[in-house]
């Protein structure tokens, strides 16, 4: 899959992440903490209008994990949810509003926002939904029109 940590990433220095690695993260105020184990399935940037709106930024930096590798370790009672579509179950802290992660049931993956787990060296490998971009990024990474074919997208690569 484009963006997987096993694929060489140009212009970056990916850290070796073993299957036994554990990383912790938290929301903005620290009321909700999470732990991820193993290694992410992929890392990259999403340019879709939904992610841009949710993140209040021009692009979302994602790390995708198998759901069983993501655990809320503290503050589950402060975990709010917002589901705009069936494709994304967004989770946030009800105390500070900090965005934590999004479950993507159609992909069978959980997106833990890269900034939420700072000890994981962010090594992006792909741009998704680049046809919706508002911020052109010339970084040599593949730019997909939508999603990889193995996740139900077209897999079409578009120019930088």
Where on the chain are the PLM-derived regions?
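A short Gly-Trp-Pro
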Residues: 8-160
């Amino acid at each position: 899959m484009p963006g997987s940590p096993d694929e060489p990433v140009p212009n970056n220095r990916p850290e070796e992440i073993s299957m036994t690695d554990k990383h912790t993260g938290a929301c903005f105020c620290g009321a909700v903490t999470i732990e991820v184990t193993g290694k992410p399935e992929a890392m990259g940037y999403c340019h879709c209008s939904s992610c841009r709106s949710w993140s209040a930024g021009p692009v979302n930096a994602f790390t995708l994990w198998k759901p069983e590798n993501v655990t809320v370790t503290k503050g589950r009672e402060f975990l709010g949810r917002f589901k705009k579509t069936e494709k994304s179950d967004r989770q946030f802290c009800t105390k500070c509003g900090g965005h934590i992660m999004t479950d993507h049931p159609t992909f069978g993956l959980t997106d833990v926002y890269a900034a939420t787990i700072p000890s994981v060296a962010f090594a992006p490998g792909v741009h998704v939904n680049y046809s919706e971009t508002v911020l052109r990024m010339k970084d040599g990474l593949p730019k997909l029109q939508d999603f990889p074919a193995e996740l139900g997208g077209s897999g079409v690569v578009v120019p930088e």
